[in-house]
């Protein structure tokens, strides 16, 4: 639940000054464009300055990361791997790669790669093929036979072309059985009531444990033919063993070049992958969060629960990174002042942490993305997620600098500011302070926002159910927004002027109320947690500040704009909403949470929605962005000893995914 997805892909990030460490190459930043997607390359500045052991560690961790790719596809939908492999076979074997039908087929395959399956990575809606079923059946007849068939042709066509079948990967609509109506592969043969009862029994049996495990995090819940409900655990020897064995192989190599502290962390992760015991996962997390000195770091595992409608099952992901020493200075200042921020938060004092422990924050350079972090990735991460670990041992927060930089370069000169920002003064602020405001918002969100506050006695942390992710992201965003406008940030040298905050306030309200709507199909509701969070904050503040015209909707030349008229009063509203959101989380107030989310975060004004889509389309700006990864190659001497690691930047999206399919695909087609 602690991952920040920025809105850079929409073009909100303005022209800004760039770090000298980031050198623009001659290659274009955008390497592919299709449908609502742009694919961007990212660079890895500073890699050449790492020690040989650090470079080698990154190589092994990157190999481990790529070995988990199939897991994410399978978690998203039971038939994803069979479908992907069938499409890849047709694509690679097709003699004629021309014509409208093939172009539509290629676009569909690119979308499947990007989303790790046949459902959109953000809206969760199933893709609609733009090629005909008749043409597709011809390709199946030509290129699919008994030897390479992954799925029966009729079932495949029904899945692809029947709009009602498996229509949504994640359905959180009010009043539906979110388990039955979601196509994700976390549950099979069970309904929502059965799932909730199964895990509630576990929670009740462990009610007095101050260090509870994350029940159900690393398993699929199924019902057998006799009606017995049980977990298929994701571990070596269990579900996904073929991929996990490869991951562990590379982790074992990584341990040989890691420093002693990190070696212990890696060995703990290996132990967990072998046992599947969530107590081992907690032990690994405690060791991982305590390692704040290692220059190279990584995430590898079943981490975030966004893809589960009940917020219990975790998707597999990996991020390999190293420290951006210069940029870390700002996060070190934040971490040093963490107790002050906690003590002065505008929330009930009972819900403040008396002692903030283990706050570790840094700015990182990503070296490899995988699983649920590839191709689309977060711009900030705060882990671990277990409340008791965060309270007793702290958390690690990171801002991913080279990713935000790549988004920035890809967005420059796209005309977004001129189209959607009404006032010249706001455009000027965005130009001068937009990048700094975005970076600091991410830092505050991850470093302090997620780690702030505490639960009331008796609250377990799972009471908010389907609304928990939205509320948690709103809580962290509000914390960041509130403190961005505090003179304390000027005092400690994080910002030169409050104009940095006002730039972010204008951006945030505009995006939450208006511009993010371009990502949603006309007539649909807002489903994704981060989008719901931003809409909730923007619309609540608009409504509560309406009497004093704090935020204003302006019509000019037939176009709608949203402007902030009073930044100080808006900050006060952020504080008031943060107080209520923290109360809801601390007390586990499900009904209040439901009312807040359903009242402000879900439904869209259809006229405004249509206008935003049309204006955004005229700019030819894809609302979503993702990445191609760099490649690493070991350089050895005549005796086979590693003497260096070579870094290259592939710039072909299709080639990278076909290469991954050939070299890093280990799971059966149906799991």
PLM segments and residue spans:
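Post-HEXXH active-site segment of zinc metalloproteases
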Residues: 453-474
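Catalytic Zn2+-binding segment of zinc metalloproteases
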Residues: 447-459, 483, 487
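An active-site-proximal "capping" alpha-helix that borders the catalytic cofactor pocket
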Residues: 51, 259, 469-486
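Long, well-structured alpha-helical subdomains associated
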Residues: 43, 481-584
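N-terminal-proximal low-complexity accessory segments that begin disordered
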Residues: 24-86
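C-terminal motif of bacterial Sec signal peptides marking the signal peptidase cleavage site
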Residues: 15-17
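Extended, compositionally biased alpha-helical segments that mediate assembly or anchoring
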Residues: 570-671
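Contiguous, non-catalytic segments that form substrate-binding/exosite surfaces or channel walls
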Residues: 110, 114-223, 229-427, 434
């Amino acid at each position: 639940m602690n991952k920040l997805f920025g809105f850079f892909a929409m073009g909100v990030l303005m022209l800004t000054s760039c770090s000298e460490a980031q050198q623009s190459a001659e290659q274009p930043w955008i390497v592919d464009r299709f449908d609502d997607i742009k694919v961007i390359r990212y660079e890895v500045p500073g890699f050449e300055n790492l020690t040989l052991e650090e470079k080698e560690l990154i190589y092994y961790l990157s190999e481990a990361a790529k070995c988990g790719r199939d897991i994410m596809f399978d978690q998203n939908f039971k038939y994803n791997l069979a479908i992907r492999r069938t499409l890849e076979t047709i694509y690679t074997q097709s003699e004629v790669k021309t014509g409208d039908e093939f172009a539509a087929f290629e676009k569909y395959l690119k979308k499947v790669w990007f989303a790790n399956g046949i459902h959109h990575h953000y809206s969760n809606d199933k893709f609609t093929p733009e090629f005909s079923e008749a043409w597709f059946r011809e390709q199946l007849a030509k290129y699919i036979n008994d030897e390479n068939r992954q799925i029966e042709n009729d079932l495949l066509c029904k899945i692809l072309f029947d709009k009602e079948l498996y229509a949504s990967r994640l359905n959180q609509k009010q009043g539906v059985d979110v388990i039955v109506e979601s196509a994700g592969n976390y549950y099979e043969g069970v309904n929502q009531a059965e799932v909730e009862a199964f895990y509630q029994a576990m929670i009740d049996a462990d009610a007095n444990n101050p260090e509870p495990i994350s029940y159900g995090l690393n398993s699929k819940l199924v019902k057998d033919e006799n009606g017995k409900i049980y977990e298929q655990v994701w571990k070596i020897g269990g579900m996904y063993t073929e991929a996990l064995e490869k991951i562990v192989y590379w982790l074992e190599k990584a341990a040989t070049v890691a420093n002693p502290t990190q070696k212990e962390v890696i060995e703990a992760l290996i132990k967990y992958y072998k046992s599947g015991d969530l107590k081992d996962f907690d032990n690994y997390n405690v060791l991982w969060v305590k390692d704040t000195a290692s220059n190279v770091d990584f995430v590898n595992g079943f981490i975030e629960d966004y893809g589960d409608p009940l917020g219990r099952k975790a998707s597999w992901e990996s991020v390999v990174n190293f420290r951006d020493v210069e940029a870390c200075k700002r996060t070190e200042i934040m971490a040093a002042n963490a107790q002050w921020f906690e003590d002065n938060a505008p929330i009930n004092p009972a819900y403040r942490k008396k002692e903030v422990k283990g706050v570790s924050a840094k700015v990182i350079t990503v070296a490899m993305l995988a699983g649920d972090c590839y191709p689309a990735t977060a711009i900030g991460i705060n882990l671990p997620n277990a409340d008791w670990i965060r309270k007793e041992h702290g958390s690690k927060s990171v801002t991913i600098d080279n990713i935000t930089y790549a988004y920035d370069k890809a967005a420059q000169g796209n005309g977004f500011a001129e189209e959607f920002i009404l006032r010249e003064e706001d455009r000027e602020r965005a130009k001068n302070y937009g990048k700094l405001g975005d970076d600091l918002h991410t830092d505050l969100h991850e470093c302090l926002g997620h780690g702030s506050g505490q639960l009331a006695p008796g609250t377990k942390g799972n009471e908010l159910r389907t609304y928990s992710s939205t509320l948690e992201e709103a809580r962290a965003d509000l914390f960041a927004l509130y403190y961005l406008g505090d003179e304390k940030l000027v005092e400690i040298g994080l910002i030169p002027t409050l104009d940095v905050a006002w730039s972010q306030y204008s951006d945030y309200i505009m995006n939450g109320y208006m511009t993010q709507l371009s990502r949603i199909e006309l007539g649909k509701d807002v489903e994704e947690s981060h989008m719901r969070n931003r809409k909730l904050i923007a619309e609540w503040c608009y409504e509560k500040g309406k009497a004093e015209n704090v935020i204003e909707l302006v019509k000019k030349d037939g176009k709608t704009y949203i402007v902030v008229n009073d930044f100080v009063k808006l900050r006060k509203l952020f504080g008031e909403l943060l107080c209520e959101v923290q109360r809801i989380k601390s007390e586990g107030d499900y009904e209040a949470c439901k009312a807040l989310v359903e009242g402000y975060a879900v439904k869209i004004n259809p006229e405004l929605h249509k206008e935003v889509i049309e204006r955004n389309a005229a700019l030819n700006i894809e609302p979503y962005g993702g990445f191609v990864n760099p490649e690493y190659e070991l350089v050895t001497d005549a005796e086979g000893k590693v003497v260096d690691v070579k870094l290259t930047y592939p710039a072909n999206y299709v080639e990278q995914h076909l290469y991954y399919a050939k070299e890093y695909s280990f799971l059966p087609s149906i799991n």
